Amino acid sequence: MERRMKGGYLDQRVPYTFCSKSPGNGSLGEALMVPQGKLMDPGSLPPSDSEDLFQDLSHFQETWLAEAQVPDSDEQFVPDFHSENSFHSPTTRIKKEPQSPRTDPALSCSRKPPLPYHHGEQCLYSSAYDSPRQIAIKSPAPGAPGQSPLQPFSRAEQQQSLLRASSSSQSHPGHGYLGEHSSVFQQPVDMCHSFTSPQGGGREPLPAPYQHQLSEPCPPYPQQNFKQEYHDPLYEQAGQPASSQGGVSGHRYPGAGVVIKQERTDFAYDSDVPGCASMYLHPEGFSGPSPGDGVMGYGYEKSLRPFPDDVCIVPEKFEGDIKQEGIGAFREGPPYQRRGALQLWQFLVALLDDPTNAHFIAWTGRGMEFKLIEPEEVARLWGIQKNRPAMNYDKLSRSLRYYYEKGIMQKVAGERYVYKFVCEPEALFSLAFPDNQRPALKAEFDRPVSEEDTVPLSHLDESPAYLPELTGPAPPFGHRGGYSY
């Protein structure tokens, strides 16, 4: 709209009219209409237009918000704005769910018709678990801020129904929840947490006892549920011998016997040690199976299989003084205490390493050469180690010839009783003294031995690895000639 002043007269007159409103809006039909012949004041025109326009929009917004408003505590209703039922009264929606979990738990529990919610039957046990504390919570004035706006009942009715529910539940304390299925006990945890959040936070003096009362009975339900669910399948599986596995179905050992006998050839027996597995199983606590059964199927092979070579000893070797082989296998003592373990060259290195033996054997100072100052004394000590009182230097020298062929020792030419090691000193001592353990040399015989007790092949203990080779190249030096029988 535009006005032009020319000579004090209005150049153009434009009448201002309002648009006709729809007859359905009562408040909008009473809008002010300006006569068409009257000129509009330029100062009052924009405010009048804006006020009427905003009043029209605000009326629609208030109506739309009032129709579509959903209570904050009602979490299950989702308004459908595209349907024709979107502008109904919210009170009708609240009355459809009078027994929802957001109402009083005692009221929903006292009524026994089947509900779509599993929470109603669970709050009875949580409230009856400690009834005096629940009654004290429900006692505040009706105007307390923690009350839910969806509760359609009065405070007196709630307290009376709570007392009835508490008294009825206390009369049968152990029959309410023990007979239910497992799916019923999984609900109270969610129910208690969702129920305490709107009411426990609104009441300032009572949030701690209210949350403690509802959360305390809830955790035992899942624990009882697990015990009931896991025992039955295990006992059913344990009663079936064919489907049970060894060692995992409780203490039902008759069911696992079939699997044990099938695993006998896999774990219990080897080609070289036939009887190892049954010798070390009784300390584990198995009294039922006999030693001949393959008891490795019990599931204890983890503690037995890592060291079968160390502890497995053939039973027929437990005779005489060969028992010492089992002791040396564990490295509890020096390995030279075992009969047959100490070789002659290691014995000579041990004598040379001890300065107290310098009067009968010593280093010459030329590399790795050494001299037997008293060869008979060296032979006597070697006989003590081997429990051979008939040992002499003649027999000792024949044994040293094996090391010539193996490249360990050599005889120094032109000098009597002088020998030398051909390997490096570091390698010599590392091989002679494994794990830095010096041999414990014996000073006396273990028992008095006469020459009648010896047998023709008993001297094989001196050097069991090279005697077949020694008989070939040196037949004149037969061992029979050196003994008197």
Curated annotation (Swiss-Prot):
There is a cross-link at residues 95, 227, 261 (Glycyl lysine isopeptide (Lys-Gly) (interchain with G-Cter in SUMO)). Keywords: Activator, DNA-binding, Isopeptide bond, Nucleus, Phosphoprotein, Transcription, Transcription regulation, Ubl conjugation. Sumoylated; enhanced upon ERK/MAP kinase pathway activation it positively regulates the transcriptional activator capacity. Sumoylation at Lys-95 probably requires phosphorylation at Ser-100. Transiently polysumoylated and desumoylated by SENP1. Sumoylation is a prerequisite to polyubiquitination which in turn increases proteasomal-mediated degradation. Probably polyubiquitinated by RNF4 and deubiquitinated by USP2. GO terms for biological process: branching involved in mammary gland duct morphogenesis; motor neuron axon guidance; negative regulation of mammary gland epithelial cell proliferation; positive regulation of DNA-templated transcription; positive regulation of gene expression; positive regulation of keratinocyte differentiation; positive regulation of transcription by RNA polymerase II; stem cell differentiation. Transcriptional activator. May play a role in keratinocyte differentiation. The modification Phosphoserine is found at residues 100, 139, 148, 215. InterPro entries: Ets_dom (IPR000418), ETS_fam (IPR046328), ETS_PEA3_N (IPR006715), WH-like_DNA-bd_sf (IPR036388), WH_DNA-bd_sf (IPR036390). SUPFAM superfamilies: Winged helix' DNA-binding domain (SSF46785). It holds the Pfam family ETS_PEA3_N. PANTHER family: ETS (PTHR11849), ETS TRANSLOCATION VARIANT 4 (PTHR11849:SF181). Epididymis and brain. The keyword Nucleus applies. It comes from Mus musculus (Mouse). Residues 158-171 have a biased composition (Low complexity). This is ETS translocation variant 4. Belongs to the ETS family. It is found in: Nucleus. Its main location: nucleus. There is a cross-link at residues 6, 138, 323 (Glycyl lysine isopeptide (Lys-Gly) (interchain with G-Cter in SUMO2)).
